[in-house]
């Protein structure tokens, strides 16, 4: 059973203090995995800014001081979202450091300690393929981690499976929406963190043993809709 297969597995979750990351971490804990979280928010987990090389090194060293192996890595930490009008060079670099460089470097630090059959999950976004105005830093980071996924999958062939998940609208407060916010979604509702956690659990299980290098979009079908003015889409209101 999927409830038993994660017992005593060593699981790492970045950005695991809140939202999707916390839900994923909690679901692994519920299944008796040994979970290590890093987040810049204060708490009982390892506290640090993963944009900093030395923080990632210290975090990896702490995990490896207690275990000689790692089974699962979930790169979830949220990059900064700012657009081209307001985002500075430094802020854009920071977003890429959190969203792309940190996942790459954390895997690099731990790759020699991955068990055979390890699983790496990178949390991207449906914004890796579609955009709203003024979201360049976030969108670039999410596109980067989606591409990093298939590169790592090939490099780590035979050692670990690497997949990414692209969430759509996920309400981390589990708000139940009615009206257009819900009905615009082909699935009929807005998503919640469990929708993502369930997929992460599946991808880390043996049931997904033939899946690697893939990106799975969990967005209630929003990115599959054709939207044309006046034709099952939006209407211009003057």
Predicted regions, residues:
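Canonical Rossmann dinucleotide-binding motif of NAD(H)/NADP(H)-dependent dehydrogenases/reductases
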Residues: 3-35
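Conserved NAD(P)H cofactor-binding loop of Rossmann-fold oxidoreductase domains
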Residues: 76-81, 221
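Substrate-binding pocket helix/loop in short-chain dehydrogenase/reductase
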Residues: 83-96, 181
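Active-site helix of classical SDR
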Residues: 107, 141, 149
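Alpha-helical segment proximal to the catalytic Tyr-Lys
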Residues: 112, 154-158, 209
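C-terminal helical subdomain
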Residues: 164, 179-211, 218-220
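Short C-terminal tail/terminal secondary-structure segment
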Residues: 212-238
């Amino acid at each position: 059973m999927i409830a038993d297969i994660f017992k005593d597995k060593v699981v790492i979750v970045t950005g695991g203090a809140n939202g999707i990351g916390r839900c994923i971490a909690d679901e692994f804990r519920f299944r008796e995995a040994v979970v290590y979280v890093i987040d810049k928010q204060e708490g009982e987990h390892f506290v640090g800014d993963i944009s900093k090389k030395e923080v990632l090194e210290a975090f990896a060293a702490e995990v490896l001081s207690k275990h000689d192996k790692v089974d699962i890595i979930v790169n979830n930490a949220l990059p900064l979202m700012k657009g081209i009008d307001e985002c500075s060079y430094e802020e854009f670099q920071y977003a890429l450091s959190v969203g792309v460089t940190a996942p790459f470097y954390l895997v690099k630090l731990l790759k020699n300690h991955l068990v055979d059959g390890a699983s790496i999950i990178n949390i991207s976004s449906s914004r890796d393929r579609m955009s709203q105005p003024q979201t360049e830093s976030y969108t670039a980071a999410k596109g980067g981690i989606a591409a990093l996924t298939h590169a790592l999958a090939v490099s780590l062939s035979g050692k670990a499976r690497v997949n990414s998940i692209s969430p759509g609208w996920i309400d981390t407060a589990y708000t139940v929406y009615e009206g257009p916010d819900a009905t615009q979604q082909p699935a009929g509702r807005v998503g919640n963190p469990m929708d993502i956690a369930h997929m992460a659990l599946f991808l880390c299980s043996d049931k997904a043993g033939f899946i690697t290098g893939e990106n799975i979009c969990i967005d209630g079908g929003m990115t599959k809709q054709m939207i044309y003015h006046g034709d099952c889409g939006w209407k211009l209101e003057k």
